[in-house]
Structure formats: C-alpha cells, structure tokens
Amino acid sequence: MLTADDKKLIQQIWEKVGSHLEDFGAEALERMFITYPQTKTYFPHFDLHPGSEQIRGHGKKVANALGNAVKSLDNLSQALSELSNLHAYNLRVDPVNFKLLSQCFQVVLAVHMGKDYTPEVHAAYDKFLTAVAAVLAEKYR
C-alpha cells in the first residue's frame, strides 16, 4: 500500500524522469536482456543490440505506461487494465518478467537520479513497481 509520502516521492522523481522516458525505458530493457537473457525470447523480431530503434521504441512504451501509472497511483488496476490484458492474453508473457524489468528500472533510476534517489525514494519506487507488476499479473489468475 502506497502512503501519501510514497506517492509524493514517486511523483517528484517521475517529474525529473520527464524528457528521459525513451532513454530510461530502453536502458531498463537493455539491462534486463543482459542480466536475464531468457527474457529475449519474447522479442524474437527485435534487433536486441543496445540502442536499437526497436528497443528504444519499446522502452518508450514501457516508460509511458509507468508514467500513466504514476498519474493513477490511486487506481493502478484501471490504469493498467489494457496492458494487463495484452500481456496476459495476447503476448502471454510470464508474469515473473514484470518483476525482472522492475528491478532493472530501479537500477536505471538509481544511476541517473544520483543523490535524489534516497533510501526513502528507493522504498517508495520498490512498492510502486511491485504494485505495477502485481496489477499486470492480475489477469493470469
């Protein structure tokens, strides 16, 4: 459960992400593909080289979806419903992969936010990304 303080920290950091959506999303995907190579199986049609247009494009989609979730912190299920349906019913992505990508996104934030990525921010984003992963996995039950 996100507290009012968590929500405030999440929104403050997300404002700083702003113009870096595509970069951060792509970097998170690249980190996931390197750290968890089994995740590449869901992208057989992608050029998986770092910086490829396909990774950058999908990274932007990921970051935009997270941005949408940040705007809807009080109703993540509704905000992510279509995305959950897509991944569960059409793409059939193993839901464990949402957690893996969340971890990689945390690393990207920590690297780029520097001293602004305090332990409190880390904890808030951990709760937020865990909630996002749980919502995306809801349709699998």
Curated annotation (Swiss-Prot):
Superkingdom of origin organism: Eukaryota
GO biological process: hydrogen peroxide catabolic process
InterPro entries reported for this sequence: Globin (IPR000971), Globin-like_sf (IPR009050), Globin/Proto (IPR012292), Hemoglobin_a-typ (IPR002338), Hemoglobin_oxygen_transport (IPR050056), Hemoglobin_pi (IPR002339)
Record's GO cellular component terms: blood microparticle; haptoglobin-hemoglobin complex; hemoglobin complex
Tissues expressing this chain: Red blood cells.
Disulfide linkage: none
Subunit and interaction comment: Heterotetramer of two alpha-D chains and two beta chains.
Record key words, sorted: Heme, Iron, Metal-binding, Oxygen transport, Transport
Reported function: Involved in oxygen transport from the lung to the various peripheral tissues.
Any one GO molecular-function label of the UniProt entry: oxygen carrier activity
Domain Globin residues, every copy: 1-141
Annotated binding of heme b, by residue: 58, 87
Pfam families named in the record: Globin (PF00042)
Gene3D superfamilies xrefs: Globins
Organism encoding this protein: Struthio camelus
Family membership noted in the UniProt record: Belongs to the globin family.
Annotated protein name in UniProt: Hemoglobin subunit alpha-D
